[in-house]
């Protein structure tokens, strides 16, 4: 049996990895198109996990037996979520997009409450979500002017929200229906097949890059591929653990904009700390500490 502290530690590690995606994706999209870049990234991610799964024959057999779970996770988590995320982000200001995407823990909590009989909304959870979203808004406003105006931006918001819903349903499916499939097999196959689908979509709708791509692009692609392989494998494993609630686990995604903002201050020349951003970071940190205040600090390093 895994301790709650152990689950929290690995959830934080996965979210810290995901927080590096925003800056890295911006670098990659300077040289490549969204669907093509995402497709190649996830194909590589799926292949990177393969050596850590099981024997080839058992791998194929497991996918054949659990093909419905693999298909749903591939479709919802990779294809629908990332297609809508990339396209929606192009239609809205960066700050607004960050807020909408940052509301993912709220969407997941609501969907989990509807689909999972043991994962209901509680007052404590709702308060944590409200403070978490407030923190995301402050971080986003502190980094960029918050605007909402055109109908096209509303379309972008709906696309990002729909992607959040797809992620939520996928998380619930993994929690309820994936107990008979190795989490590394699930992450490897869903990332690989999802990457192929995204790449195939890119062929008729995107022109693709012209000329050779620089070393910077390939290094960025390799990092994003490694990051996705590691983070998704950890997350799928955590979702399968007995007693882990989808909504509670996803509360840790509120730290993604916190660490993302911190990384931007270190990496991006024009980015610097603002009092609104720092306030948002503090609010998110305090809300998570209060929610998990009954978890002993020492358990964070147990059973790793």
Tell where the protein language model's regions lie, with residue ranges.
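Specific transmembrane alpha-helical segments of multi-pass solute transporters/efflux pumps
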Residues: 17, 21-22, 53-101, 138-139, ...
């Amino acid at each position: 049996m895994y301790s709650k502290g152990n689950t929290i530690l690995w959830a934080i590690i996965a979210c810290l990895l995901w927080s590096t995606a925003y800056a890295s994706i911006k670098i990659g999209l300077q040289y490549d198109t969204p669907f093509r870049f995402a497709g190649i990234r996830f194909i590589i991610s799926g292949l990177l996990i393969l050596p850590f799964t099981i024997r080839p024959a058992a791998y194929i057999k497991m996918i054949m037996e659990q093909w419905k779970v693999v298909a749903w996770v591939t479709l919802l988590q990779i294809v629908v979520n990332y297609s809508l995320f990339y396209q929606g982000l192009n239609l809205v200001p960066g700050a607004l997009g960050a807020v909408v995407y940052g509301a993912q823990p709220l969407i997941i909590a609501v969907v989990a409450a509807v689909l999972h009989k043991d994962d209901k909304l509680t007052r404590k959870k709702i308060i944590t979500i409200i403070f978490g979203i407030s923190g995301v808004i402050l971080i986003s406003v502190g980094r960029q002017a918050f605007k909402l105006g055109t109908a096209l931006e509303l379309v972008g918001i709906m696309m990002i929200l729909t992607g959040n819903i797809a992620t939520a349903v996928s998380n619930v499916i993994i929690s309820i229906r994936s107990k008979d499939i190795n989490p590394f097999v699930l992450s490897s196959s869903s990332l690989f097949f999802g990457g192929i689908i995204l790449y195939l979509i890119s062929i008729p709708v995107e022109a693709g890059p012209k000329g050779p791509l620089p070393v910077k692009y390939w290094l960025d692609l390799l990092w994003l591929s490694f990051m996705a392989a590691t983070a998704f494998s950890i997350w799928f494993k955590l979702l399968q653990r007995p007693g882990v609630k989808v909504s509670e686990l996803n509360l840790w995604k509120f730290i993604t904009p916190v660490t993302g903002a911190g990384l931007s201050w270190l990496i991006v020349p024009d980015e610097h700390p603002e009092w609104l951003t720092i306030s948002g970071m503090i609010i998110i940190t305090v809300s998570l500490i209060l929610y998990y205040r009954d978890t002993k600090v020492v358990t964070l390093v147990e059973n790793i």
